[in-house]
Every structure is written in structure tokens, then in C-alpha cells.
Amino acid sequence: MIAVSYEKEVLSVSNVIRQISFTRINADEFSVYAKWSVKNYAEHLIKSGDEKFRFKARKAAKSEFMDIFPEGADSADNYLYIVKNEAGEKIGVIGYGKSPFEENAAFVTENIIKKEFRGKGYGKSALILLQEDAKEKGYAKMVLNCFKHTPVSYAMYEKNGFKVIEDYGGSVIMEKLLID
């Protein structure tokens, strides 16, 4: 049984996995996150094996980041959250935005849990809460990109009902219907 509560800008979920909550990312947190995210995404592009990104990865990552978040933390149709554990510690960042490719679909823009909290159910709990949030905002589907060199993430998405709809070699696009 999952209990979801929405209080102002705080969301929380509890079930047998983990008690977590979300708060909307603020401008200061976004500034730190943006620097990390561009670097991290560039590294993933390189690891995905696409040779064209070897020398242009950082530029490509920054360009894509700016397309997604043109107004920073306040970008329209984007919901970026800090994930907090039971003790209120900041343990990750997760978010989605309106898909530029499909009508009525939420596209996951970030899903990262700090290493020391991985493998303990926090990622799954955050994904469940993110889906509930998107569903509450009227989205019928959730879509995401998953790099193939991240098998733990791929397995988590698959176990949570996401299906591969496109394969790009180094990454796949996965989706899940949010409505019954």
C-alpha cells in the first residue's frame, strides 16, 4: 500500500520500501545541480560509445541542459525535486518535464540518488512518487532515456513497468503508462 501526500511544494511517499519526500529545487540548489548535471551527462554520453560525443560531449550536454531548463529552476513545465530521506537528508535529485516528442507525456530529466543511498529502495520510492506526481498533473505516460552502461538503473526501470520503445545503441528510450 502506497500513501502519497501533497503539501505545498513537498511531496512524500511511504510504503514498505522507504519513506522519502520531495521539495522543489530552489535557485541556489539548481546552480550547484546544473554544473554537476552537465558534467555527469557529458560523461554518460562518452560512455555510451557514441564517438561523435568524445570531443563534443560537454558542449552537447550543456546545449541539451539549456534546452530543458532555459529559465533555470523556474523553467515552465519542468518539475525538478530534491529527494530527502526519512531523516530529511538530501539524498538525490529527480525530475521531469513536458515531453517535446509526445503529447501528454512526462519526460524524466533527472533521476540520481547519492551512491551511499543506492540499493536501499530510495530510487524505487523516488520513481514511484515521481510517477504519482506526473499522474496528478495530468500526464498519461512517463518516458525516459536510459544509458545501457547503467544496468542497475535499467533493471530498476524494467522492474517498475517501463518498456523499451527505441534502441539507439548506447541508450534506450523507455516508457510506462500512468493511467489504467
Kindly label every feature range from the protein language model.
Residues 118, 135, 158:
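Short polybasic/polar patches that bind polyanions
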Residues 124, 148-166, 172:
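Conserved active-site alpha-helix within GNAT-family acetyltransferase domains
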Residues 135-145:
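Conserved GNAT acetyl-CoA-binding A-motif
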Residues 121, 138, 161:
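Short glycine-rich hinge loops at helix-strand junctions in the catalytic core
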